[in-house]
Amino acid sequence: MHTAGADGRQFHGLMADPRIVEHHRLVSFDLPWHGKSPPPEGAIQGSWRLSTDLYVALIMGFIAAAGLEKPVALGASMSGEICLELAYRHPEAFTGIIACEACDKINQRQTAWAAHPQVNQAQFVPEWIRALSAPQSPAEYVDQIAWHDGQGGPQVFFGDIAFYSDEWDARERVGRIDTNRCRLFMLTGEYDYSCTVELSEATAAKIPGVRFLAMKGIGHFPFAENPKRFAEYLLPILAELKG
């Protein structure tokens, strides 16, 4: 599942990795208002606001419509957060869940500039998020992340961050996630200053049975900024879940 303001193109690197696709089928979808998924008919431009309940409903609806049987859920940033919610609400629906760059509450990442009528969001948003990638990540992938985020519609990124760093608050429920019903993995890049390793680790400490790992040489967009390096962390987990 893609990050804020982006779309499924973030997974092209993983989908082109023969080590992964030889044994696994990867499926990515665009949220409404993102990528190839248009806004609902009659929706007012700039009105998109993501919430926990809406996000869960969209994901579970997609799984049902696509006929996926107990998939492995993978997300980062806002989609990493919702992975925690999926583990809490629907553990029976998944073989495993991999929540990257996620914690139970993120503060101070919402920015009014992303919705200001006098600010060019196509220029502002890419620069707001560019430094979240690790310095070792290949420039071509970092540039692609910025390009994707710059193509979002008016206030789409803002509406996503309204969930990521405002509405989302799982501090009172992550401790009730049952990892006996669904195996849960949390991975966070060492260069992520939005959802830091410390924040993720503190959340993981509340969840009995979770597996937490800090990723070296990776920032906030693991599967998009450095898919080859991220695959080194992902492949052992997929092998474990498959076995």
Walk through the language-model features, giving the residues of each.
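Conserved alpha/beta-hydrolase catalytic His-Asp/Glu region
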Residues: 108, 121-179
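Acidic catalytic loop of the alpha/beta-hydrolase fold
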Residues: 190-195
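Catalytic active-site module of serine/aspartate enzymes centered on a nucleophile-bearing elbow/loop
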Residues: 210-243
